[in-house]
From Swiss-Prot:
Residues 310-747 are cytoplasmic. This is Fibroblast growth factor receptor. The keyword Acetylation does not apply. Disulfide bonds join C99-C151, C198-C251. The lineage of its organism: Eukaryota, Metazoa, Chordata, Tunicata, Ascidiacea. GO terms for molecular function: ATP binding; fibroblast growth factor binding; fibroblast growth factor receptor activity. Belongs to the protein kinase superfamily. Tyr protein kinase family. Fibroblast growth factor receptor subfamily. Its main location: membrane. The gene is FGFR. Residues 710-719 have a biased composition (Basic and acidic residues). One of its GO terms (biological process) is positive regulation of cell population proliferation. Receptor for basic fibroblast growth factor.
């Protein structure tokens, strides 16, 4: 039935099996029959139609006898296009979400971000709504736009909803990457056709491409326009070339980050008539003359190079030597290697070797900005040692304001059991600490001693030792596992621990790691044993022996053999030897677990060779006793298998700052609470613990070893499990309880 009311035509949704006569009538008088109409059911697209599904204007009502209730309830249009719920978009892109809906009018569509109603100006750049709120647009998305977006459509008959999830991926700030396969020098004859190809391998932002020719002047041959495609711009074809076409051709590609280019030469030869070709045999004597002339020129050039090298060497002052003494007179290695290498940003050259004498000599040029005099440093007792390094407490005499002052310091140096690699690691640590600079929550470098003696690194001194021992030392009495030998008294406890203190320690370490990430430095060995506790409960990140500079790339791939903290490493670091800021975030999650377990050992009972399978199965460390559910969720976020889904240190600082502000300074750890966690020590060792200690003793390591030797391809040379007690019940008498900064290979 078709009716005309208020100048609008209403078409009742009726199915006719055959043609029928349709009449029109006005509000005042009937009209004549005008046509024969075969009606069919048709649902219009609500994104383009200004009328509802029954053909009525929004202000009119529908006859209930012509539409069933199920057509009145809101329902989605093209629901198959809404199946993709997770959208990963690069930062800076425009994102659109659509919820096309139909049903009885009026229908209201509301949008929510993580459960909160979306306001039009609720983000930088605002939200844009189109098609009666059925489409939302986010221009130039940023990291804070990561969320779940839900559209809710409802009318008086019911409501439906649909949720999209947006993941914003940070862009890689590099210019376009070009392939030079198609840009090779070519030599052709006049009249030939030449093709140069310039393939863009990668460009985060859309690149702009131009083709240039360099001869006497630069000529723009081809430029991308509005209607050109990428395939057209990647190819330059020259037909019927002439001598004027010879020269250098360049493909220039640029984006908002920078410009890249590849070039090739075109040489054009004349067409030679075969009838004009003639050859003249070169006399045999001429061959001999050319050969002799070449040999003489080579000898003269070689003599000139030797003369210039000798002249430059004689004009330079001889480098000073640093003897690395061997006080224990351990026999040197029988094989001598003398590689020549350039170290870091130092303007110096060094020759590394293991000679047949009892010392190693390194040629190094002093850095006047950091060089200290040995007579200004007074060494005291040894406060920590490992396999290849040791740390002494010292007094540093410095001049400030015209008068001398004494500063507490820690001096790190190598032991007699060192190797060339240990020396290189110590030099790398020195170079990293110089480059990183100063921050409240990292151990700052005070200076170095590279001349007239063994190599010293002079750093700040933390009076309360490392964080792991501090937490264990201040556990409630019934959980205390004393850090002492049977003949020595237990170390004194500092002060009762509060949950706010644990939260403050976590927040400070996150701030220090945020600073290192801004400096493009990955730590690779973040753990409670490498965080020092200074006065006023100030946390300082230490041990840059494994730290690496990633200013040129956003990652570091380990290619050599060496020891790594296996149970603190991210999954991709274990399997692919790939280290990024995201792997440091994983290690920070383990550090949080250590803090709120009061110095517990991670993955108790899990063998290192089973750890990868354990993590790939989705298993993670259990919630520690003193961590809240919110904090444990933060740990689990740090242990996401995909590095892109882990939070950044900036976000971790914000979250921990909020948690710290809401925590109470009077909330002490419950001294009477029972604790039966697997990560705390037990009076009776399991068989697994015994095997771990036996293995450790056989290799010269204690049972609390955390490093695994890894080769360049991720294979394990051997295994040391950490399922044993927190500390060796009979530690070396030279190791005191307030352990300080450790070397890379120390345990």
């Amino acid at each position: 039935m078709i009716q005309l009311q208020n100048t609008f035509i209403f078409i009742a949704l009726t199915i006719f099996t055959s043609a029928s006569t349709t009449s029109l009538k006005n509000e005042t008088k009937p009209l004549n029959t005008i046509s024969t109409l075969a009606a069919q059911t048709n649902i219009s697209n609500p994104e383009e139609d200004l009328f509802d599904t029954n053909g009525a204007p929004k202000s009119d009502t529908v006859n209930a006898s012509t539409t069933t209730d199920r057509h009145k309830i809101p329902r989605w249009v093209n629901e198959q296009k809404m199946q993709k719920r997770l959208h990963a978009e690069p930062a800076g892109n425009t994102v659109q979400f659509r919820c096309a809906v139909q049903g009885a009018r009026p229908i209201t569509v509301d949008w929510y971000k993580d459960g909160e109603p979306i306001k039009k100006n609720g983000r930088l750049g605002g939200y844009k709504f189109r098609q009666r709120n059925q489409q939302i647009s986010l221009e130039s998305v940023i990291m804070s736009d990561r969320a779940k977006y839900m559209c809710v459509a409802h009318n008086k008959y019911g409501s439906i909803n649909h949720t999209y999830e947006l993941d914003v991926v940070a862009r890689i700030p590099i210019p376009p990457v070009l392939s030079a396969d198609g840009m090779k020098n070519q030599t052709v004859k006049v009249g030939s056709t030449v093709t140069f190809r310039c393939r863009i391998v990668y460009s985060d932002a859309h690149p702009h491409v131009e083709w240039l020719k360099y001869n006497v002047n630069v000529t723009v041959l081809k430029r991308a326009g509005i209607n050109t495609t990428d395939a057209e711009m990647e190819k330059l074809t020259l037909k019927n070339v002439s001598f004027a076409d010879a020269g250098e051709y360049t493909c220039l590609a640029g984006n908002s980050i920078g410009v890249s280019h590849v070039s090739a030469w075109l040489t054009v030869l004349p067409v030679v008539d075969e009838n004009d070709v003639w050859t003249e045999e070169i006399p045999q004597d001429t061959h001999y003359l050319i050969y002799i002339f070449g040999v003489v020129c080579f000898i003269i050039l070689l003599a000139f190079i030797v003369y210039m090298c000798n002249s430059r060497y004689q004009n330079k002052d001889p480098p000073r030597l640093i003897p690395i003494e061997n006080p224990d007179n351990i026999p040197p290695m029988s094989k001598m290697e003398e590689p020549v290498m350039l170290f870091g940003n130092e303007q110096a050259w060094r020759r590394m070797c293991l000679p047949h004498a009892d010392h190693i000599e390194i040629n190094i040029q002093p850095d006047l900005q950091w060089e200290l005099k040995r007579e200004d440093i007074l060494l005291h007792e040894r406060i920590d040692e490992g396999f290849f390094g040791q740390v002494f407490r010292a007094d540093l005499i410095r001049c400030a304001g015209g008068r001398k002052e004494k500063v507490d310091a820690a001096v790190k140096m190598l032991k007699s059991t060192r190797t060339e690699k240990d020396m290189l690691d110590l030099l790398t640590e020195m170079d990293q600490m110089k480059r990183v600079g100063k921050h409240k929550n990292i151990v700052n470098l005070l200076g170095v001693c590279t001349q007239n003696g063994i190599l010293w690194l002079v750093t700040e001194y933390a009076q309360k030792g490392n964080l792991r021992d501090y937490l264990r030392r201040n556990r409630p009495s019934e959980l205390q596992y004393e850090l002492s030998t049977p003949d020595s008294p237990a170390p004194p406890r500092d002060e009762p621990l509060t949950l706010r203190a644990l939260m403050s320690a976590s927040h400070q370490v996150a701030r220090g790691m945020e600073y290192l990430s801004q400096k493009k430095c990955i730590h690779r060995d973040l753990a409670a044993r490498n965080v020092l506790v200074a006065n006023d409960f100030v946390m300082k990140i230490a041990d840059f022996g494994l730290a690496r500079d990633i200013r040129s790339n956003d990652y570091y791939r380990k290619e050599t053999r060496g020891h790594l903290p296996y149970k603190w490493m991210a999954l991709e670091a274990m399997t692919d030897n790939m280290f990024t800021h995201a792997t440091d975030v994983w290690s920070f999650g383990i550090l949080l677990w250590e803090i709120f377990s009061l110095g517990g050992s991670p993955y108790p009972g899990v063998k290192t060779h089973d750890l990868v399978r354990f993590l790939r199965n989705g298993d993670r460390l259990e919630q520690p006793q003193f961590a809240s559910s919110e904090l444990y969720r933060l740990m689990r976020d740090c242990w996401e298998e995909s590095p892109r889904r882990r939070p950044q240190f900036r976000q971790l600082v914000e979250d921990l700052d909020r948690m710290l502000a809401s925590s109470s300074s009077l909330e002490y750890i419950d001294l009477n609470s029972p604790c039966e966690a697997d990560y705390l020590p037990s009076d009776v060792d399991s068989n697994e613990d015994t095997e771990s200690r036996d293995s450790a003793n056989a290799t010269g390591e204690d049972s609390d070893s955390v490093f695994e030797p890894i080769d360049g391809h991720g294979a394990h040379a051997y295994e040391v499990d950490e399922a044993g007690p927190l500390l060796n019940p009979q530690p070396d008498a030279n190791i005191v309880c307030n352990g300080h900064a450790r070397m890379q290979s120390d345990v």
